[in-house]
Amino acid sequence: MAPAIGIDLGTTYSCVGIFRDDRIEIIANEQGNRNTPSFVAFTDTERLIGDAAKNQVAMNPQTVFEAKRLIGRKFADPEVQADMKHFPFKITDKGGNPKIQVEFRGEGKHFTPEGISSMFRRKKREIAESYLGGTVNNAVVTVPAYFNDSQRQVTKDAGLIAGLNVLRIINEPTAAAIAYGLDKKAEGERNVLILDLGGGTFDVSLLTIEEGIFEVKSTAGDTHFGGEDFDNRLVNHFVNEFKRKHKKDLSSNARALRRLRTACERAKRTLSSAAQTSIEIDSLYEGIDFYTSITRARFEELCQDLFRSTMDPVERVLRDAKIDKSSVHEIVLVGGSTRIPRIQKLVSDFFNGKEPNKSINPDEAVAYGAAVQAAILSGDSTSKSTNEILLLDVAPLSVGIETAGGVMTPLIKRNTTIPTKKSETFSTFADNQPGVLIQVFEGERARTKENNLLGKFELTGIPPAPGVPQIEVTFDVDANGIMNVSALEKGIGKTNKIVITNDKGRLSKEEIERMLAEAEKYKAEDEAEASRISAKNGLESYAYSLRNTISDSKVDEKLDASDKEKLKTEIDKTVSWLDENQTATKEEFEAQQKELESVANPIMMKFYGAGGAPGAGFPGAGGPGGFPGAGVGGAHSGGDDGPTVEEVD
């Protein structure tokens, strides 16, 4: 059985683990460290990843870090604009998306955040392969619980670029809960609160654990808050102190800021175990040495508003789960920033003096849980402890569609257990409207303009009638938290669907190929995999389009019964083959498609020869995927300039 690893790709540090022989092994890197810095550096001669990259960050402005803060975001996002002030590397705007600009081997290069992320993943994969002595293809990857749909999609993309088959994306606090609960044999249901405060993200989740069932009740957090924000407060404090003492402003000098930031991070860590620490940096700026000190009390004062804000998501998860804080049996702290004594005290005080559980390593807990889930999903049935685990996670944000007047109509509410599927019926807004624009949003606000647009698609060819068409919209959220949305016009069976992929934010094939070429590894394999997936998707789309076509009543009444049965048998055979051969080669998928076409084409030609209308929906007769006129240039679809559907009471 091929091994599957668990990867925790943190904002500042990453960790990889494997579950085998009934125990977890956190895999050390080539430096012997169990956590690897999430840094990648570019020089005139090479690319450095991990410890080697972080060790030269003060000298090399071409060192990229905190790429996770940019994942799935737009260049114009306030968070991205704020981060740019602290980064030594340049962020540029390409099509509304942030690109990281560096000098590599004497040339200017642009990387996407997911491209940088894939380099860390490939590094963790190589560390695991070196340790295990074999190839590793499968992984469970963790994300902050509050990552939205597009951030999850981009995370999956980064796994693909790294040559990994991402078995599942799981939420970081949920993974930590597995780490906590794996060996717990307590009888009865226990309410466990996981507080995960890392370098750049913050999550709080409340779970109930009972006899191996881990059920997430609620989750809250901030995907842009963590230890780096505490570092920024220290950096700003010392920049002002330097200005006050020496009448010079070092904030415009990138190298001086990088050296100061490194010293501030070290000081922050020291203050978790000491009441005071000193900072000594020789020739920090214009030949001036900077020697100073800071106490834990002063650090806590600088960050007091940030520290206090960590309790807001805690209150929210308890409120959402309808659980009183006195009913929480255990509080588990995860992430390096939870080592800060003030945060531990705030948590303890909030829970009326209850001490947090410190039985698991806060730096390794997430990778630990991911490794357990990887073993389960890869079919490891050798362990009794993993055989008894069932994981029930939730959707972090409400998702729905825009209805008349720009109203957000949620179909799946936040904290709904996933995977889940929900359908609701709507009608057209205007009389004789030939099409509808389905716009999918994510968020908690009442107006769609205040929520996040995930994607949109059109459903056209609707019979003209005043408010009569019944359009069933279905949302299907998978176990990764990624969505499929479909719409069906019930009268004539017109259908269309979308996988919410945030296309504008994702990598094009050319960008993926360029990154693979620059990484100088596995280019041929990844290109072959992309075309294999394309062939698989093509066959799948063709088979299902054919199935929809012969189910159409207009086609059904004119199609010869024996022909229909023959075609149905061939389609069923193809779909069954697809289910059992997901890893087949491109040539095998193409051969299956030719075989299906050889049966379908003569039958459909005969049907059209007998007077069947091309508008009946034969695959390829119209728009993409066998939905005639559904794409650009089809019938008027209501346009982009206003809401086109309303809810049916």
UniProtKB/Swiss-Prot annotation:
PROSITE patterns: HSP70_1 (PS00297), HSP70_2 (PS00329), HSP70_3 (PS01036). Coiled coil: none annotated. It comes from the Eukaryota. Residues 614-641 have a biased composition (Gly residues). InterPro entries: ATPase_NBD, Heat_shock_70_CS, HSP70_C_sf, HSP70_peptide-bd_sf, Hsp_70_fam. Keywords: ATP-binding, Chaperone, Nucleotide-binding, Stress response. Gene3D superfamilies: 1.20.1270.10, 3.30.30.30, 3.30.420.40, Actin, Chain A, domain 4, Substrate Binding Domain Of DNAk, Chain A, domain 1. One of its GO terms (molecular function) is ATP binding. Belongs to the heat shock protein 70 family. This is Heat shock 70 kDa protein 1. The gene is HSP70-1.
